Amino acid sequence: MSAPLPTTLGALKASPFGAADQRGRSVKDEIRANLLARLAQGGPLFPGVLGYEDTVMPQVVNALLSRHHFILLGLRGQAKSRLLRALTTLLDPALPVIAGSETNDDPFAPISKFGRERIAEAGDDTPIAWLAPDQRYVEKLATPDVTVADLIGDLDPIKAARGGHLLSDELSILYGMLPRANRGIFALNELPDLAGKVQVGLFNVMQEGDVQIKDYPVRLALDVVLTFTANPEDYTARGKIITPLKDRIGSEIITHYPTSVALARTITTQEAWTARGGIPVRIPDVVAEVAERVAFEAREEKRIDQRSGVSQRLSITLLENIVSNAERRAVVLGEPAVVPRIADLYAALPAITGKIELEYEGELIGGAVIARELIRRAADATLRERVGPIAAEDVVIWFDEGSALQVSDDAGVATALAGFSTVPGLLDEVRRAGLGGADDGDLLAGCELVLESLVARRKLTRSESGQYGRSVRRKPGMSSERPEGDE
């Protein structure tokens, strides 16, 4: 069992925390020392953050080793905030502060009048409190209405009256978020949204390490690591961020979306809530891949605003909605397992349409139409990646002769599979392509994958109600590879 932490200044001086190398150590030096130790151990640098091992993380490490303030530039859903929160794992497990201090005063070098008076009065009997790493992380979303008082502080007449202080007394100050983040990490998200005069207020903190409260000549020598996030377009646009502030940010680091479907699936599996503690959930591999590829297709779609980006949250919420639709079906039908189908992606359209911002051309046809196209293209890309293009001539001929097929989204696995078995050659084509899998759920997903791929290539059509039918013949010279909407 570890020894209890000191509770008074005298006990703190006699403990290892009172050693000469611990006194006056800045938070940047603390993070640097812990980061070097983690690098030497070879463990994961930032637990829970995936895909940045060879790109972003080395740059973040360099910034921290250089004791820089830094900014993460990237589109939404690129784990910028997650990465900043992971910095707390580089802080010491416990930090001593003067009990009751609003500015987390160092017992050996207090910066506030409260801290100095407390030590002058109590001496070695000054009570000591301890902060955990999470208590030393302060995060703020920048908005145009954020004021200098919010970040730095203001004179508080009510506090002065209650304490019997003059307004000129430092004890009448109501501290903002930055002083309260002293000896910790302060993260400001969406920096360009901060008003220019408030950005000016950050200058001294970044350059000199101190702040001034209004016109009162109090200077607080803050010890804080400043981190920021921003959208690259906003960050570089003139007028969004003032040049002197940008010049004071030590490192500018660009984030990105997952570079491969396999990596993206790993992230989605980590973040999505699929193990629900009720009926067992088994997601066919092709269904999970199609769901993941929807985001990749969206990032290539010209009718979607790529300056806004397509968040990784799209894949996460999409998979959760897919599982929920399958869960509802399994409960109603009394099935022993929750087995999602590709058809469930269409029931999860709200998870897609709510995550994309459309260009003018996209607004004309609507988000739902584009979302359906993304699903079909994702299915086609999945099939091509796994087995290459499939002609499925018998299947196409059957539909071209006027036949149609509609399998209810609420049908169970056995019923749906029976419906797909009426299409000549479909099950054989799926098995021949190696899409049959281990059970009927995989076989069903393989059937849907083939049909959706044929729809994407305009060899079949799929109505909004889910009915597959023959393709509408197009004029010679028109593309037959990419869908443009529901037939």
Mark where each language-model region is.
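Conserved ASCE/P-loop NTPase catalytic core
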Residues: 2-262, 273-289, 302-306, 383-487
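Amphipathic alpha-helical core segments of compact helical bundles
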Residues: 65, 69, 88, 296, ...
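Short alpha-helical scaffolding segments that buttress acidic/His motifs in well-ordered protein cores
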Residues: 268, 291-295
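C-terminal helical "lid" subdomain and adjoining coupling/linker elements of P-loop NTPases
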Residues: 277-284, 297-371
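Charged, amphipathic alpha-helical linkers/stalks
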Residues: 357-400
